[in-house]
Amino acid sequence: MAIFKKPPTGGGGERKRRSDIPEGLFQKCPGCNEVVHEIELIENQRVCPHCDYHFAQSAKERIESLLDTGSFVEMDASLHSVDSLRFQGMATYKDRLKKYQESTGLIDAVLSGYGTLEGIRVAIAVMDFAFLAATMGSVVGERITRAIEHATAERIPIIIISASGGARMYEGMLSLMQMAKTSGALARHAEARLPYISILTNPTTAGVMASYASLGDIIMAEPKSMIGFAGPRVIKETTHQDLPKGFQTAEFLEERGLIDQIVHRRKLRPKIAEFLRFLGPAAA
């Protein structure tokens, strides 16, 4: 007589297969390899409760966590990218845009508008890396420029939260023009003696970092964000030299004065409000 019996393999006693678990219910943290429930991440502003690793946040999540509840008003939602170059590849530019619009619920890689932060009126633009690596095309550049110009006209601060792989190759020179356009709008905002707070998140690179992301009166970054122009691999292959430890991280750049302060995501809202009040009556 068998001492041990195999568990039943059929009927109602069958174990739930791994494939029956909803996709995305759990996330493995790249920082500590712990498995974290999606609900726990949402409640913790997408910060790992074990090691404080900062997962990517959507533009909508960032606005909800920073601005006063119900105060955000979106601007320029009708702007759409066009395939002026008729770009051809493994997929057309139009097809790629449609794919990311469906997966993110966004029209393009930035969400812009205005609202209040601890009662302070602000204009805001937030990049979303989930949309084509938050590359900057003509719509992204135009929406950011209009957000800046709205802030200047209303004499309120502008906050830009960056995360980007750089200029959008599908739009060629039109994407590169946005670097000058956004920078020009910020120069006029500065001439009006109005505050601009730039927040760098992981990753902020290339044309975005070389333009508006690095022009803030106050530049903050989330911990361990990758920040730079070209990637470390490209630089190493070009220079044939080993790079310093921590090269192109927020901590490395803070030590050298490019970043004013590294701020944990859960402390961003009060820290931004503190800086805006410090920067003078125009921010109040």
Q: Model regions: which residues?
A:
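N-terminal alpha-helical interaction blocks
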Residues: 1-17
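Conserved catalytic cores of soluble enzyme domains
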Residues: 165-283
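Short cysteine-rich clusters marking metal-coordination/redox-active sites
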Residues: 29-32, 48-51
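Cleft-lining beta-strand/loop regions that shape enzyme active-site pockets
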Residues: 109-190, 197
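Cys/His-rich microdomains that often coordinate metals
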Residues: 35-36, 54-55
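An N-cap/entry alpha-helix motif that binds or orients negatively charged groups
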Residues: 11-16, 27-28, 55-112
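Residues immediately within or flanking Cys/His clusters that coordinate Zn2+
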Residues: 26, 45
